[in-house]
């Protein structure tokens, strides 16, 4: 049976707009009959991918681009300066064609130099996969690849971010990578209450007697919410994608850190909503369980505030899951302030941030050792 690691967080943001829709307003969703502020899963994952650059080495990460031919060709030329850019592009294009990834020349504007062939969609490949492909092209030069040879390079030992968040190749489903992480849209635990920031700016070189109005004015919509965030990580799927137990441990360590610490950055120059979670619960289970239904009824703040009421509701939901379905976690850790501890101590073993990451890593290593017996 598969092993899952569930990540739960309650996090309060002051007035802000870190994830907006096409109308510029903070994203929202209906839940429990009320409108809630929302942070999309795509925005959360994008922030996490950016943070990985500070936690993992370049060769452990991937790039997502249509320009796979130009990117590979550049690495071919870097590996062997005697290869011309034209040759490198031709050989790179042929290699991707063998793999079943279609590339074509993009339409050039008038008087614009022709560009290298591109994929018709974003392709997510590991840096080390592109480096290995470039090295193989340098070795084979104009000798044709077989499909098996190319797939052995670009469809094995995937990068950490590719392994976590998955990959879809429109031309060939066999090249898809099943995501090891499922990420929920973060939602506010209480009803959304939009507000507006009307701002003006004055032209520094306009004299007061010449103009009394503003040089520019506008409005930014903002909201403040306590969010419930949830994601689940399939340990077995991640191991299959990475192909290495050591890479698995490093990936889980990095993901735990980035889930806790990262957020989208929309309008942060205007709002500086750089908060950290008020509560973190990480649980190891045999099947994923979200506690979002704790907030199906919008939380009303009491004299202790919204976060205390939301924490109590989440702990009650976790207890209900255990009582009704017998789905108690194998291990569970909790990060919470002393003020919340009495309400949430049933969620797991209280610990600190560094200790949680370390103990989670130890648990995964022990689980691997046990599975190998």
Regions found by a protein language model. Name each.
Residues 1-38, 42-373:
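Basic polyanion-binding and macromolecular-assembly surfaces
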